[in-house]
Amino acid sequence: MALQLRGNTKKKYLYPMILVTGGTGLVGAHLLIHLLENGKSVRAVYRSIASKEKTKHLFSYYHRSDLFEKIEWIEADILDIPSLEKAFENIEFVYHCAALISFDPKDEEAIRKTNIEGTANIVNFCLAFGIKKLLFVSSIAALGDSNSVEKIISETTEWNPEKPHSDYAISKYGAEMEVWRGQQEGLDVLIVNPGIILGPGFPNQGSGVLFTAVAKGLSFYTKGTTGFIAVTDVVETSLKLMDSAIKNERFTLIENNYSFQEILNCIADSLQVKKPQWHAAPIVMKVFWRIDWFLNTFLFQKRKLSRASAKASYSESKYDNSKISKFLDLKYRSVKDYIHTISGN
C-alpha cells in the first residue's frame, strides 16, 4: 500500500545517508561502528535513552567513543509511521536490523506485530522514498525444514507451514515475505539469515545470555546442533553485499555448525569456569518447559523456556553456508577463537 507522506520530503542535506534500524541491538550497534569507521554518514533509530546507552557502551568497549558522537539519532518506532517519515529523509540505503526476540508464548502478538508489520512499514517507506537498496537481517529460524530427503538446510529449503515453528521463526518468515513483496514492487533487496550470532556488549539478551549463564555456573548442556557466527562476520558480509551490485538474493550466514555442548564448553574454557556437567536429554527438556509453563501460569513468573526453544535445544539442525562464497570472497573467523577473544582469554 502506497504511503501518503506529509510535507516536504526533499529536505536538502550535505551528504546522502545510511539508515540503520535496530542500532541499539547486537548487529545494528556493530554495524554502526563499521559504517562510521568507513567514513559513512549514518542515521540510527532508537526508542529509549537506555537503549542508546547500550550502544554507547559498545563503542567504548572497542575504544571508538569518538565515533558515537557522529551518529544522527532519531527517536522512532518501526510501528509508528509519523516518526519513521523523519527517519527516512535523505536516506539512500537501509539496513533493517530491528526485531523483537522472545520465546515467551505470551509475546506472540507483539512479536508478529513488530517483526512483520514493522518490516512492512520499512519496506513501504523504502518504496516511497526511492531507497536504492534494503538489506534485511533475518535469521536461520526463517529457513525451511530439513526432512528425510534434504538433511542440510539451505536458502532453497522449503518452509513447511504444517510443521511446528516458534513465534519468532514465523514472524521472521512473515517479515521476509514483506521484503520480497517490496522487491516485486521495484525495490532492490537483500536478505541475510545468520545463525546464532555471538558478540560482546549485550550480556542479558540474545546469545549474550549463554555467556552469562555459563559464568554463573550453568550445570547442564544439550546435544542439539545449529549454526553459529561471529557478529563481526555478519556485519562485514552485510557491508560487502550492500556495496556490491548483488541484489534480490538471500544468504545463509554461519561459520560452521556446532553442538550446544561444544559452544558451552568453549565459553566455559574462555571464562575459566567449570563446564556444564549434566546432559539434559530431550525428555528432561520436555519436563523443563512444562515446569516453566506451570510457574508462569500459576505463579506469574516470566517464561524462560518455551516448548519451541526446548525442542530447538536438542534438535540437530545443520545449515549449508556455501552460497555466499559463490558471490563474495570471504573467510569467516572460527567461532571458537572468537569466543576466546571476546571473553578476554
What do these predicted ranges mean?
Residues 121, 205-206, 222-242, 249:
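Substrate-positioning beta->alpha
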